[in-house]
C-alpha cells in the first residue's frame, strides 16, 4: 500500500540553472531524492555553446557523470548550424541524425537521415510546397506527397490548398469560409495498400467520402455532416462554450446527446446533462482551479461515479477515491476504493496502490473479462514501486499483489533506448530509434517517416496475423487493415478514419461509428448497415464517463445501463474490466486516455504509439527534444498528473490566443489613439484573417501580462508600481540573456515584462496556435526594442504585432517605428499549426509563480515615486502609446464586415484607459515632461 509522502523528500531539492558570462544557460542542476532515508543525488544537464552562443551539444545526467573519465564522450544530442543560425545537422543518441539543407528563404529543400532516407521538397514561386520526393533506404524514389493550390476565384479558394495527395490517398478541399476555415473536404482512398508514387497512384472509384462543416461567428462548428450524411448539431453560449449536441442520423432519427451544460466563471464545466438523463457534476478548488470531485448519477437510481481527487501543493495527484463504491472484503483483504500515489523530488511516480482483478498482470493483453459491470466485489489490493535511472528511464517495476512479479528493463549505456530484460537494446532498434519487435516473433515495420507501418502478432507459412496502417498528410492514422487466420481461412477487416466517423468493414459486417466529443467524454453511436449482432440495439449509443485524464471508466447505453466498467494501472495497463455481454464489450476500442487500443496492445496517440506494459513510447518523440533529452519517456513518468494528447509532449493546459476579435468592443475607444474618429488606413482584403490573428495575439498578451509593461510609465502607475517591482525581480532571476522559453515563462508567472518579454511571448503564442494562418512569424529586434511581425518582409509588407505599447494596433510594418534603424529578424515560423515546440504550459508557469512571485515586497508610494523619478531621469521608463509612425485606425475586412484594429475589447478598456490617463498626467507635469521617452 502506497503511503502518502510526508514532503520531506522535497526539502532542500531546488532546481538550479547556471548561466555563462553572456547570460546563456550552460548547466541545469536538479536534486533527486526518492526516500527520506536516502542521500540526495545531484543530476546535471550540461550545455556547451559555440562562440556565437548557439548551443552545440547537450549531455544528460547519465552521460555527464562519465565526462570526467571520458572527456571526448559524445553528447546526448548536438547540432551543427549555418552562419545564419539555421540548424543543418541534428544528431541524437535516441533518434539518430538528420541533415537538412535550406533554400535562400529558409525553406527546407533536402533532408537525409540515419536510415538512409532522403526527401526533396519543391516549392512554387510563392514558396508553397508542391511535392515531396521520398527515397527510403534501398527503395526507388517516389513522390510521397503532392500539393495543389487554387488559381481561380470562387469559394474563397484562391491561393489556398485544394488537393493534398498522401500515403492514404487524396484529400480535396471543396471550399473555404471567409476567415479561412475549411467548409468541406472529400477523402479518396487508394485502391491498394502499396505506398503511392504520385500522380500515378490509383484511387478507388466513386465520389469519395465528403465531410462538410458550418461555423458560427466565433469560429465554432455549428454543424458537421459526415461522409454518410449523419449530422452533428451543436449549440453554444454567447461566449462560445458548448451547451448542447444533437445527432441526426441519415435515416431521419434524432438523438439528443448533450442536453445542457453549465460553466463556472473560469469556463470550467460544472454540470452536464447527457442524452440518457445522466447528470455529471464537477467541483473545483476555487484557489487553483483543480478538479476536486467528479460525479455522475441517474435520476432515482444509484450513483454511477463519484471520484474524489487529492493533490500535493504543486498539483501532483496523490489520491483518488471512488465514493460510489463501498468498502469490500474479499480473499481475506479489506478492499478500499482508493488509489494512492507517491512521488520523488522530480515529481516522478515512485509508488502506487489500487485495485486489480484476480490474475491481472501488466502486459499486451487484457485481463479476463468478468461479468456484472459495476460490481467490484472481487477485486484485490495491489501495490507497485517504480525505479528510474538519472535520465528518467524506468528500470524496474515491482508489483505486489495476488501475483508478485518484477519487470526490469535494460537501458543502453549511451542512449535512452531500452527493452525488457534480458534483451539487448543495441540490437532492438533501427538507426532512427524505432523499436524493431514487440516480443520475439512479433516484428514491427516502419515507414521512412518513422511511422509504424505494420505489426505481426503470429507468423505462419499459410498466412500471418498482422495489421497494416496508413497515414494522411497531417501524420494521423487514416486506415487500419487487419488480416487474421481463422478456421483455416484468411480473413480481412478494415477501419477507415474520417472526421467524426469510423467505417468498419469485415466479412459479413458493415459498421459506422459516429464519434462525438463533448469535451468531457466521448459519445459513440454504433450504426450497422449489415451484420448487426444479436442482442445489441441498432443504433447503439455509448456514453463514456471519463476520469481526469479522459480514460474511459464506465460505458453507458442510451438508457443509462452500464455496458462496461474498467480500471487502469497508473501507466495505462488495464487492471480490471467487466461487462454484461462479451459481444458488447468487444466493440469498446477507446480506453486509456481516450485512445484507441490495437490488438497488438499498443495505444495510438496520433503521432506515435505507446506500449503500456513497457511504460514508454516505442520510438523517439517526433517533436524532438520538446519534452527533454529522453525522447522515450512517457509524460515525465508522472501519468496521474500529466496527459499527452498526441504523442509529443505532456501538457495539462497551455497558453493560447483568445478570440478577442469576436468579443464586444468599447464604442469609440479608438479616438483615444488619434482623435480622428473614423479616419485611417485599410488593409488589403486578403489580409483580413492575418489581421484578426494579430489582433487576437496583441490583446491575449495584454491579458496574460495584466500588470502591463514593467517600463511603461502609465502601466507602472496603474498597477501601483507592481509592474515595475515584479518586472525588476523577474529580470534579476532570468539574467541578461536567458533562453527564450525561460524568458516567456517567467514573464507570464510575473504577469508583466519588458518589450523583450512581450515580443517573445507573442511569437510563442502565434507559433503554438492551432489558428496560425500559415504565414511566416519573425521576432523583430532593434537596439532598444523587440516586437514581432506576421509575414516575410522580403516578399510582402508584414503586419506588426507589438502588445508592449500601451495601445496596440495591428498595422503594416512599413508604417511602423519597429521597421526603422538596425533591425534583426529571427524566424519563429512553426512546422505545423499548433506546433508543440512553442507551447507554454500552465503547470510550469504556475510553479514559477508560486516559487518566485507570490510574496514580492511592497514599498511605500513615496519610495516608488522616487524610484520612478530616477528611472525617468535615466531613460529607463517609456510612454510609448503606439508603434505606428502615424497613429490612426486600421481597417480590415472579416466575414464580409469591416473591422477596426484600433478597437479595444470591452474587457480591456478600463486598464488601457487608466494607463493612458496616467501618461497624460505625467506629460503635463513639467517635472517629467522632458524626461519621458517615446519613439
Stretches with model-predicted labels:
Residues 35, 64-81, 94-95, 129-162, ...:
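Acidic/glycine-rich beta-solenoid
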Residues 652-935:
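A structural boundary/capping signal
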Residues 382, 561-577, 601, 607-608, ...:
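Short turn/helix-capping motifs enriched in Asx and small/polar residues
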Residues 533-606:
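A motif-centric feature for acidic-aromatic and gly/ser/thr-rich catalytic loops and repeats
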Residues 17-24, 51-54, 61, 188, ...:
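Glycine-rich, acidic and aromatic/proline-enriched surface loops and short helix-turn segments
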Residues 1-45, 50, 208, 217-220:
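Thioester-forming pentapeptide GCGEQ
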Residues 20-21, 32, 51, 62, ...:
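Short, flexible loop/turn elements at secondary-structure junctions
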Amino acid at each position: 500500500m502506497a503511503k502518502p509522502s510526508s514532503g520531506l523528500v522535497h526539502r532542500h531539492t531546488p532546481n538550479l540553472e547556471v548561466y555563462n558570462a553572456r547570460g546563456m544557460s550552460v548547466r541545469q542542476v536538479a536534486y533527486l531524492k526518492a526516500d527520506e532515508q536516502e542521500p540526495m543525488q545531484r543530476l546535471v544537464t550540461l550545455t556547451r555553446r559555440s562562440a556565437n552562443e548557439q548551443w552545440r551539444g547537450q549531455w544528460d545526467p547519465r552521460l555527464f557523470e562519465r565526462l570526467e573519465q571520458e572527456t571526448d564522450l559524445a553528447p546526448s544530442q548536438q547540432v551543427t548550424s549555418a552562419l545564419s543560425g539555421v540548424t543543418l545537422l541534428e544528431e541524437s543518441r535516441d533518434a539518430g541524425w538528420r541533415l537538412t539543407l535550406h533554400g535562400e528563404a529558409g525553406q527546407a529543400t533536402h533532408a537525409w537521415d540515419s536510415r538512409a532516407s532522403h526527401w526533396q521538397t519543391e516549392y512554387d514561386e510563392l514558396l508553397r510546397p508542391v511535392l515531396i520526393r521520398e527515397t527510403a533506404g534501398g527503395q526507388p524514389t517516389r513522390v510521397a506527397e503532392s500539393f495543389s493550390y487554387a488559381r481561380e476565384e470562387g469559394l474563397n479558394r484562391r491561393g489556398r490548398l485544394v488537393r493534398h495527395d498522401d500515403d492514404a490517398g487524396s484529400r480535396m478541399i471543396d471550399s473555404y469560409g471567409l476567415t479561412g476555415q475549411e467548409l468541406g473536404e472529400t477523402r479518396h482512398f487508394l485502391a491498394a495498400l502499396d505506398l503511392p508514387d504520385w500522380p500515378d497512384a490509383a484511387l478507388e472509384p466513386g465520389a469519395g467520402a465528403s465531410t462538410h462543416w458550418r461555423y458560427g461567428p466565433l469560429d465554432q462548428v455549428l454543424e458537421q455532416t459526415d461522409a454518410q450524411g449523419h449530422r452533428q448539431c451543436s449549440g453554444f453560449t454567447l461566449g462560445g462554450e458548448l451547451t448542447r449536441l444533437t445527432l441526426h442520423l441519415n435515416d431521419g432519427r434524432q438523438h439528443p446527446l448533450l442536453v445542457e451544460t453549465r460553466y463556472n466563471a473560469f469556463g470550467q464545466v460544472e454540470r452536464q446533462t447527457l442524452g440518457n438523463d445522466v447528470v455529471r457534476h464537477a467541483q473545483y478548488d476555487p484557489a487553483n482551479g483543480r478538479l476536486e470531485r467528479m460525479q455522475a448519477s441517474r435520476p432515482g437510481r444509484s450513483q454511477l461515479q463519484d471520484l474524489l481527487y487529492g493533490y500535493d501543493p504543486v498539483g501532483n495527484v496523490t489520491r483518488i477515491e471512488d465514493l460510489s463504491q463501498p468498502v469490500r472484503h474479499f480473499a481475506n483483504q479489506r478492499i478500499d476504493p482508493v488509489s494512492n500515489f507517491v512521488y520523488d523530488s522530480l515529481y516522478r511516480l515512485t509508488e502506487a496502490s489500487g485495485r486489480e482483478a484476480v490474475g491481472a498482470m501488466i502486459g499486451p493483453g487484457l485481463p479476463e473479462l468478468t461479468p456484472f459491470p459495476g460490481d467490484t466485489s472481487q477485486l484485490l489490493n495491489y501495490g507497485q514501486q517504480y525505479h528510474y535511472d538519472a535520465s528518467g528511464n524506468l528500470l524496474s517495476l515491482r508489483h505486489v499483489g495476488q501475483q508478485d512479479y518484477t519487470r526490469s528493463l535494460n537501458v543502453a549505456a549511451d542512449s535512452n533506448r531500452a527493452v525488457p530484460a534480458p534483451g539487448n537494446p543495441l540490437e532492438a532498434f533501427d538507426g532512427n530509434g524505432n523499436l524493431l519487435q514487440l516480443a520475439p516473433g512479433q516484428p514491427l515495420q516502419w515507414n521512412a517517416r518513422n511511422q509504424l507501418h505494420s505489426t505481426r502478432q503470429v507468423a505462419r507459412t499459410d498466412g500471418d496475423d498482422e495489421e497494416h496502417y496508413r497515414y494522411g498528410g497531417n501524420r494521423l492514422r487514416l486506415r487500419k487493415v487487419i488480416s487474421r487466420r481463422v478456421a483455416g481461412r484468411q480473413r480481412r477487416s478494415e477501419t477507415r478514419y474520417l472526421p467524426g466517423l469510423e467505417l468498419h468493414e469485415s466479412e459479413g459486417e458493415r459498421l459506422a461509428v459516429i464519434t462525438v466529443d463533448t469535451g468531457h467524454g466521448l459519445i459513440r453511436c454504433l450504426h450497422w448497415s449489415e451484420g448487426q449482432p444479436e442482442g445489441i440495439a441498432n443504433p447503439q449509443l455509448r456514453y463514456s464517463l471519463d476520469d481526469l485524464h479522459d480514460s474511459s471508466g464506465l460505458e453507458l447505453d442510451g438508457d443509462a445501463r452500464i455496458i462496461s466498467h474498467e480500471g487502469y494501472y497508473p501507466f495505462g495497463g488495464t487492471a480490471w474490466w467487466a461487462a454484461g455481454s462479451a459481444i458488447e464489450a468487444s466493440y469498446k476500442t477507446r480506453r486509456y486516455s481516450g485512445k484507441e487500443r490495437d490488438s497488438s496492445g499498443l495505444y495510438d496517440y496520433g503521432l506515435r504509439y505507446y506500449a503500456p506494459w513497457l511504460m514508454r513510447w516505442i520510438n523517439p518523440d517526433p517533436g524532438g527534444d520538446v519534452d527533454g533529452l529522453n525522447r522515450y519517456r512517457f509524460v515525465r513518468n508522472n501519468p496521474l498528473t500529466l496527459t499527452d494528447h498526441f504523442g509529443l509532449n505532456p501538457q495539462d493546459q497551455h497558453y493560447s490566443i483568445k478570440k478577442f476579435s469576436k468579443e464586444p468592443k468599447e464604442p469609440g475607444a479608438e479616438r483615444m489613439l488619434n482623435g480622428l474618429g473614423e479616419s485611417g488606413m485599410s488593409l488589403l482584403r486578403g489580409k483580413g484573417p492575418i489581421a484578426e490573428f494579430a489582433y487576437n495575439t496583441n490583446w491575449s498578451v495584454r491579458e496574460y501580462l495584466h500588470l502591463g509593461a514593467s517600463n511603461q510609465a502609465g502601466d507602472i502607475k496603474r498597477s501601483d508600481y507592481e509592474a515595475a517591482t515584479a518586472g525588476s525581480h523577474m529580470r534579476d532571476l532570468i539574467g541578461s540573456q536567458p533562453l527564450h522559453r525561460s524568458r516567456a515563462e517567467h514573464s507570464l508567472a510575473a504577469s508583466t515584462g519588458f518589450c523583450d518579454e512581450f515580443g517573445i511571448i507573442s511569437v510563442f503564442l502565434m507559433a503554438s496556435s492551432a489558428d496560425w494562418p500559415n504565414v511566416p512569424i519573425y521576432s523583430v529586434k532593434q537596439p532598444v526594442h523587440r516586437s514581432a511581425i506576421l509575414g516575410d518582409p522580403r516578399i510582402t509588407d508584414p503586419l506588426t504585432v507589438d502588445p508592449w505599447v500601451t495601445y496596440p494596433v495591428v498595422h503594416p510594418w512599413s508604417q511602423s517605428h519597429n521597421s526603422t534603424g538596425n533591425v534583426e529578424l529571427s524566424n519563429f515560423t512553426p512546422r505545423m499549426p499548433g506546433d508543440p515546440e512553442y507551447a507554454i504550459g500552465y503547470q510550469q508557469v504556475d510553479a514559477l509563480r508560486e516559487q518566485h512571485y507570490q510574496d514580492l515586497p511592497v514599498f511605500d508610494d513615496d519610495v516608488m515615486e522616487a524610484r520612478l523619478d530616477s528611472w525617468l531621469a535615466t531613460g529607463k521608463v517609456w510612454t510609448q502609446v503606439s508603434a505606428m509612425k502615424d497613429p490612426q485606425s486600421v481597417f480590415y475586412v472579416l466575414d464580409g464586415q469591416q473591422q477596426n484594429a484600433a478597437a479595444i475589447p470591452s474587457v480591456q478598456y478600463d486598464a488601457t484607459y487608466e494607463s493612458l490617463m496616467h501618461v497624460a498626467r505625467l506629460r503635463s507635469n513639467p517635472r517629467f515632461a522632458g524626461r519621458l521617452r517615446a519613439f
